[in-house]
């Protein structure tokens, strides 16, 4: 794949630059801190310098903000055209450029949510980077890319569209055994949603898994769905909401025991792989306070 030159300023784009543009294409917005962690090994000054070059080239731009707020970056039309010229947009669903530009025009509440999703993505990347046997080959935060329709238990046979906040995989290597793939869907709770909504979404994921729909999407056979286990990670605002959600999942019909794992935002940002995750199956039992590591 040839790397195009910027048409606004005479710069040579590096592969890392295209990775930055691709990530902005998927997630719509991120901050300099996010970019520093994902692309510059935490070196914020290096990130600032390169992002300034991309801004001067007209490939990315900054949303209006108050002086006390962090800069929030987004992909410009020239950035989209650069991805198109590099052939990268061919890897995604086909949309015209005006549609893709409108996708970046979102309100402040949506921006806050998407930045919270990026906080989660960065936390996982930093935690995995510290463990040599782990890697994250894919972490997508564009809901459309991993959406699915499923016959929901409460929809009386009607198909329901589920749009995850994210999907990612952690690959765990070992000297003797084959690489183990941990697959996760991500939901970052906005706290404005009812517990019933979160339970309903969890039921949709469970139906998608048990029906073999996810296995088919992974290139497997519907009948061999157990060969493609998934976990749904729900990130909530407080221990109180975490515990109430766990109890609501157990009380659902049918009960949701273990496909959904729940953690608070505060715990996740500190140690996403650690023993912070609560399983509904343990709610209300003697192990009510038990939590588990994500990758044992």
Model-found features: residue ranges?
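Electrostatic, structured charged patches in enzyme active sites and in nucleic-acid/phosphate-binding
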Residues: 1-18, 84, 88-296
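Nuclease-adjacent, charged terminal/linker segments that flank catalytic cores
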Residues: 1-105, 296
């Amino acid at each position: 794949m040839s790397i195009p030159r910027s048409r606004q300023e005479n710069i040579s784009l590096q592969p890392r630059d295209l990775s930055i543009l691709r990530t902005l294409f998927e997630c719509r917005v991120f901050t300099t801190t996010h970019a520093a962690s994902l692309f510059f090994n935490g070196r914020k000054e290096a990130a600032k310098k390169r992002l300034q070059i991309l801004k001067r080239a007209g490939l990315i731009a900054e949303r209006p903000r108050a002086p006390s707020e962090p800069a929030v970056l987004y992909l410009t039309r020239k950035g989209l055209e650069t991805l198109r010229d590099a052939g990268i947009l061919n890897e995604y669903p086909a949309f015209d450029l005006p549609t893709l530009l409108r996708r970046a025009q979102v309100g402040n509440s949506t921006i806050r949510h998407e930045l919270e999703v990026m906080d989660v993505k960065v936390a996982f990347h930093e935690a995995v980077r510290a463990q040599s046997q782990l890697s994250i080959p894919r972490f997508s935060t564009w809901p459309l890319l991993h959406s699915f329709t499923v016959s929901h238990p409460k929809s009386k046979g009607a198909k329901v569209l589920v749009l995850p906040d994210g999907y990612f995989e952690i690959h765990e290597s070992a000297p003797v055994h084959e690489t183990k793939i941990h697959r996760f869907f991500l939901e970052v709770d906005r706290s404005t949603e009812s517990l019933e909504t979160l339970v309903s979404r969890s039921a949709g994921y469970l139906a998608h898994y048990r029906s073999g729909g996810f296995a088919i999407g992974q290139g497997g056979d519907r009948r061999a769905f157990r060969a493609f286990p998934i976990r749904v990670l729900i990130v909530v605002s407080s221990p109180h909401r975490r515990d109430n959600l766990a109890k609501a999942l157990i009380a659902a019909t049918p009960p949701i025991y273990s496909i959904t794992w729940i953690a608070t935002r505060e715990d996740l940002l500190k140690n996403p792989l650690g023993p912070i995750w609560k399983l509904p199956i343990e709610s209300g039992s003697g192990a009510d306070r038990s939590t588990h590591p994500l990758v044992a």
